[in-house]
Amino acid sequence: MKYRLGDARVETHPDSWIAPSAAVIGKVRLDAGASVWFGAVLRGDNELIHIGEHSNVQDGSVMHTDMGYPLTLGKGVTVGHNAMLHGCSVGDYSLVGINAVILNGAKIGKYCIIGANALIPEGKEIPDGSLVMGSPGKVVRELSEPQKKMLEASAAHYVHNARRYARDLVEDPA
């Protein structure tokens, strides 16, 4: 569900999709093929939250900003279930694992995997092509080319799945 907050309106591309139980509020922009899944909350009450083309925010994830810390997902980003992102940027074709936390001012490069339950502290910069694990998150190695292709496939799968849900999801009161 989209909500206006004062003059701040959610901007959606016609090819984006928001699940009925998601809450997308205020200064939020979804590009073509972007999707926000069930129970996710994107609260753009301070700064812009920009969800790039073909990016997906999965079930239960929370995104928020502080003044001076907008939140940006590049192209083809996958944000796993129950992740929490706050005032950060995530580069193209990166994956944020289940329950991962990324804090204000952190910058995740392109083609990165932030492992499940990882914590990326404020202001931390992660180089392109990194696998990050732990709390606090540490680069454990570089991704292989097949792993990078898997990140592209993950994003493409969610674009296809969102289109299927937009077309076929019907409330069933029975």
Swiss-Prot record:
InterPro entries in the record: Hexapep (IPR001451), LbH_gamma_CA-like (IPR047324), Transf_Hexapept/Carb_Anhydrase (IPR050484), Trimer_LpxA-like_sf (IPR011004)
Protein origin, superkingdom: Bacteria
Pfam families reported for this sequence: Hexapep (PF00132)
Homology family: Belongs to the gamma-class carbonic anhydrase family.
Protein name: Uncharacterized protein PA3753
Organism the protein comes from: Pseudomonas aeruginosa (strain ATCC 15692 / DSM 22644 / CIP 104116 / JCM 14847 / LMG 12228 / 1C / PRS 101 / PAO1)
Organism lineage string: Bacteria, Pseudomonadati, Pseudomonadota, Gammaproteobacteria, Pseudomonadales
